[in-house]
């Protein structure tokens, strides 16, 4: 192992006493320096050690090495064509030994046809005009203390449950001042059982929470990354919501109207959005523009929008994912906004939803005395 580390530092032009962490240096490697089979094999061994990979046999390891090499070549080619320093970067993250097809099967849902869900939700949604006059230049709910730490969904396509709990956690924290981690496992067990589907939507979670008097905390109903029998009736203490709203792009919508709706909503609270995430496989940072998105109509994942910003004139959303803090920007992805595309990047404008919750009496009393619910001054 020591030899491999020294080889890596030598190829990077770094000393062995460099303060750059092994994890970060692997992600930020200039892969043009790793072109021979021997160099790639040595890098693979270092990557395996970093991520604790152990394969069943030599055949499996050889297969994973070949995939790792193909991914390395793809990363090198894509990074060489980045449009600006702020464009998204790819790297040898923890998914570097699986193919795009394996990644989709393991971490994403089966593609969803959003048209039927839009028809169903349109029957329930409240029609209203959204406007957002003079919004702050940037916004980040993480700085307001209403976002729990990044979680890891494991090898299953249940991003919908994590996006839903994240939205409820934030709504509850904004309304009560109490940030608590909620149970994705309860949603996995109970929503899937009641819906008869393993391909859920975030709004189905909100409906279930409303109908069953709340959602359990993660401590009371911990995550197991597999479905089980619903135990909701055994949990007494619940976090409740008062309703939910949907943001749906209709045939009459314009890109500007959709942007206004999202801005208006996110300044009130984080929102859950659906997206085609196949191209998130090797993302390590920067503003994702969706140029290689396979289909804006085939939704297969859900993330939580927690804010927005801009870099050198390029606007982006800040989205919390559920693949652990060691993916992307410490578990987050920046997704370009104001692209001029009505559908948004990878279809994210199609279908968004968020729970609603009234403020507690304590916070209402404080606001009456002159304290605003949320300070919307620029961050």
Curated annotation (Swiss-Prot):
Cystine residue pairs: 190-230, 293-346
Pfam families xrefs: Inhibitor_I29, Peptidase_C1
Key word Kinase present: no
Any single biological process term in GO: proteolysis involved in protein catabolic process
Modifications after synthesis and translation: N-glycosylated on its propeptide.
Keywords attached to this entry: Disulfide bond, Glycoprotein, Hydrolase, Protease, Signal, Thiol protease, Vacuole, Zymogen
A GO cellular-component term linked to this record: extracellular space
Annotated site location: Ancestral active site: 200
Places the protein is found: Vacuole
Chain positions listed as propeptide in the UniProt record: 24-122
EC number(s) on file: 3.4.22.-
Group of enzyme by EC: hydrolase
The keyword Hydrolase is annotated on this UniProt entry: yes
Active site, UniProt feature: 301, 321
Residues in the signal sequence: 1-23
Residues carrying a glycan: 70, 292
UniProt-recorded Gene Ontology molecular function terms: cysteine-type endopeptidase activity
Subunit description: Homodimer; disulfide-linked.
Family listed: Belongs to the peptidase C1 family.
Role according to the record: Probable thiol protease.
UniProt name for this protein: P34 probable thiol protease
Source organism of the structure: Glycine max (Soybean)
């Amino acid at each position: 192992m020591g030899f491999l580390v020294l080889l890596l530092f030598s190829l990077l032009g770094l000393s062995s006493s460099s303060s750059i962490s092994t994890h970060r240096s692997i992600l930020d490697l200039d892969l043009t320096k790793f072109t021979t089979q021997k160099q790639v094999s040595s890098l693979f061994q270092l990557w395996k050690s970093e991520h604790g990979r152990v394969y069943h046999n030599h055949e499996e390891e050889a297969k994973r090495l070949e995939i790792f090499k193909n991914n390395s070549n793809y990363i090198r080619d894509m990074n060489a064509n980045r449009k600006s320093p702020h464009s998204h970067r790819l790297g040898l993250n923890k998914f570097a030994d699986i193919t795009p097809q394996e990644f989709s099967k393991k971490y994403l849902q089966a593609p969803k046809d959003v048209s039927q869900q839009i028809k169903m939700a349109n029957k329930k949604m409240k029609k209203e005009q959204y406007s957002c006059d003079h919004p702050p230049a940037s916004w980040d709910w993480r700085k307001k203390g209403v976002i729990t730490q990044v979680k890891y969904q494991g090898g299953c396509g249940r991003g919908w449950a994590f996006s839903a709990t994240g939205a409820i956690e934030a709504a509850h924290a904004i309304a009560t001042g109490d940030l608590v981690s909620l149970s994705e496992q309860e949603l996995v067990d109970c929503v899937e059982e009641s819906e008869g589907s393993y391909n859920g939507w975030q709004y189905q979670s909100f409906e279930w929470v409303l109908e069953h008097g709340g959602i359990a905390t993660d401590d009371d109903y911990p995550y197991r990354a597999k479905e089980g029998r619903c135990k909701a009736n055994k949990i007494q203490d619940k976090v409740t919501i008062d309703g939910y709203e949907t943001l749906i792009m209709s045939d009459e919508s314009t890109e500007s109207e959709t942007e206004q709706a999202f801005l208006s909503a996110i300044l009130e609270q984080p929102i859950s959005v659906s997206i085609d995430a196949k191209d998130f496989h090797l993302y390590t940072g920067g503003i994702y523009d969706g140029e290689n998105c396979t289909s804006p109509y085939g939704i297969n994942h859900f993330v939580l929008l927690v804010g927005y910003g801009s870099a050198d004139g390029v606007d982006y959303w800040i989205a919390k994912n559920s693949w652990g803090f060691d993916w992307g920007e410490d578990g987050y992805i920046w997704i370009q906004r104001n692209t001029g595309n009505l559908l948004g990047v990878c279809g994210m404008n199609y279908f968004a939803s968020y729970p609603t919750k009234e403020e507690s009496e304590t916070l209402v009393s404080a606001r009456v005395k002159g304290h605003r619910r949320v300070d919307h001054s620029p961050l």
